[in-house]
Amino acid sequence: MLKSNLEVDNRFSLIGKVADFPKRNKSPSGIDHCLFYLEHRSNKKEAGFTRQAWCKIAIQISGNQLIEKTQSITVGQQLLVVGFVTSHRSSNGLNQLILHAEQIEFIE
């Protein structure tokens, strides 16, 4: 626990553009899921030099609270996504980092 009493053991936030069409499905237990990729680009200072930062990360949204927000997500739209990260092993055996969204904010 930090001095500010915040629990941030696995907290991740990223601003980026939606890179592909969201894929929606429902689990056998009836939970709605939405998956899409978010692409981030920025310039950051590191050791006195400017470097380009770029990443493309899978965003997983689950449950009724946020699923309604996903209905208006379109390719190219800029979003702030806050949540926690997990690793998922794909069918080809590669590990992929996934950001599980707990908060989504549309940026105009």
Curated annotation (Swiss-Prot):
SUPFAM superfamilies: Nucleic acid-binding proteins (SSF50249)
A GO CC term attached to the entry: primosome complex
Gene3D superfamilies, alphabetized: Nucleic acid-binding proteins
BP GO terms, sorted: DNA replication, synthesis of primer
GO molecular function ontology, one term from the record: single-stranded DNA binding
PROSITE patterns assigned: SSB
Keywords: DNA replication, DNA-binding, Primosome
Top-level taxon: Bacteria
Residue stretches making up the SSB domain: 8-108
Similarity comment: family membership: Belongs to the PriB family.
Quaternary structure and partners: Homodimer. Interacts with PriA and DnaT. Component of the replication restart primosome. Primosome assembly occurs via a 'hand-off' mechanism. PriA binds to replication forks, subsequently PriB then DnaT bind; DnaT then displaces ssDNA to generate the helicase loading substrate.
Function noted in UniProt: Involved in the restart of stalled replication forks, which reloads the replicative helicase on sites other than the origin of replication; the PriA-PriB pathway is the major replication restart pathway. During primosome assembly it facilitates complex formation between PriA and DnaT on DNA; stabilizes PriA on DNA. Stimulates the DNA unwinding activity of PriA helicase.
Protein name (Swiss-Prot/TrEMBL): Replication restart protein PriB
Record organism: Histophilus somni (strain 2336) (Haemophilus somnus)
Species lineage: Bacteria, Pseudomonadati, Pseudomonadota, Gammaproteobacteria, Pasteurellales
